[in-house]
């Protein structure tokens, strides 16, 4: 388990939301002063599949979810303070049973 991220200092934020799955997944893009691209958002109950271009690190900030990586059979649980990574040019499914999941996604270099 990692420490919960609470603040990102000196970053630019795109005000236009990234809206997926009819508004069930909503995020905003952040660029840090070091040039690192991230999204911060919420996921409502449901199961969603995402394809990745670049490798991603997902930090779960709040709520509970289960994740299944491309090519895997088993779902793994994640909660606040946990992290999972997804390869570039891959995919993952995420399920939220109840409540909201708050997350921070960091796009990592390939």
Mark where each language-model region is.
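Short hydrophobic/aromatic-rich beta-strand segments that constitute the beta-sheet cores
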Residues: 50, 67, 103-105
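Ligand-binding loop in jelly-roll beta-barrel domains
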Residues: 87-110
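Short, conserved beta-strand element in jelly-roll/cupin
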Residues: 52-67
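Conserved short histidine dyad/triad with adjacent acidic residue
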Residues: 31-53, 83-88
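Short acidic-glycine-tyrosine-enriched beta hairpin
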Residues: 72-89
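Acidic, Ser/Thr/Pro
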Residues: 4, 22, 27, 40-44, ...
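A short, N-terminal "cap"/entry segment at the start of jelly-roll beta-barrel domains
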Residues: 1-36
């Amino acid at each position: 388990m990692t420490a919960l991220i609470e603040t990102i200092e000196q970053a630019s934020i795109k005000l236009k939301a990234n809206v997926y799955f009819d508004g069930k997944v909503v995020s905003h893009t952040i660029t840090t002063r070091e040039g690192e691209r991230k999204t911060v958002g919420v996921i409502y109950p449901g199961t969603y599949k995402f394809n990745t271009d670049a490798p991603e690190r997902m930090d779960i900030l709040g709520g509970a979810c289960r994740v299944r990586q491309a090519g895997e059979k088993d779902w793994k649980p994640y909660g606040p303070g946990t992290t999972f990574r997804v390869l570039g040019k891959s995919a993952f499914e995420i399920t939220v049973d109840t409540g909201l999941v708050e997350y921070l996604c960091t796009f990592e270099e390939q």
